[in-house]
């Protein structure tokens, strides 16, 4: 993130802070030469800082400025990536017939987006300290493959990242289903029994932050190339949208894809993993998706939907006690 911050400082934040918090004339003499700025990005490509780099009372290395800049960056980038990927998935992939399911909520799309938009600034504020620690040099991130522990690690870092984060998220997610925690933190995400791509970030903000922690903790524990970290950050966002897209293209006993995660939303206590089914199998929480899900005709047959609804209603009563959701079909019946 230090490389990203160099770029954003040069093109956005230097001028913004100079306008909002201009430096006094004697402060300008105390600041380091602009020659030392952009040291992170300059390892890749030369980027000359503008005159604004020294014209703010908050220098680039000021911890408050770095926190604010990271907060804005995480929020804006996360929002853009969420809206773009979820909208593309909804338009091109999501089976709109799912919106006719008896458990699809009234105004659900609007509610999902609203929940995500409210959660994102809080999640960004909670995540910014971790990125701040990275920027200030406390992580094990490195720039080039030559900085890896050994040559093969350049390739191993990806499966190692997936393995570590999937293990950690499994236990965090399973913990969020504990009765003492579920209703306060995780229930808002399970409001969407029939999820759409917009449900991917429709969390309680603390829930979303908890489940993202393994991604941000990883580079403090293990070496990771900076470019790989940014790429994995984008991949995780897209993957989170994909497992809510309702397109069950992958019938795999290993990959925890959309079908597996749909079972989790349907029936609550299964398939807690994020990427693979290994820890669900070890923990006894794996449930193989029904064959009907992979057939576009059978999945919407009345007998299959009725079977789903009966089990859903039983489990909602078991897990939540009562169902306070407002379903679209119930609204139509009373109108």
Swiss-Prot record:
It comes from the Eukaryota. A motif (Histidine box-3) lies at residues 261-265. Its cofactor is Fe cation. Glycans are attached at residue 256. A motif (Histidine box-2) lies at residues 186-190. Its EC number is 1.14.19.-. One of its GO terms (biological process) is sterol biosynthetic process. Delta(7)-sterol 5(6)-desaturase; part of the third module of ergosterol biosynthesis pathway that includes the late steps of the pathway. The third module or late pathway involves the ergosterol synthesis itself through consecutive reactions that mainly occur in the endoplasmic reticulum (ER) membrane. Firstly, the squalene synthase erg9 catalyzes the condensation of 2 farnesyl pyrophosphate moieties to form squalene, which is the precursor of all steroids. This is Delta(7)-sterol 5(6)-desaturase erg3B. It comes from Aspergillus fumigatus (strain ATCC MYA-4609 / CBS 101355 / FGSC A1100 / Af293) (Neosartorya fumigata). The lineage of its organism: Eukaryota, Fungi, Dikarya, Ascomycota, Pezizomycotina.
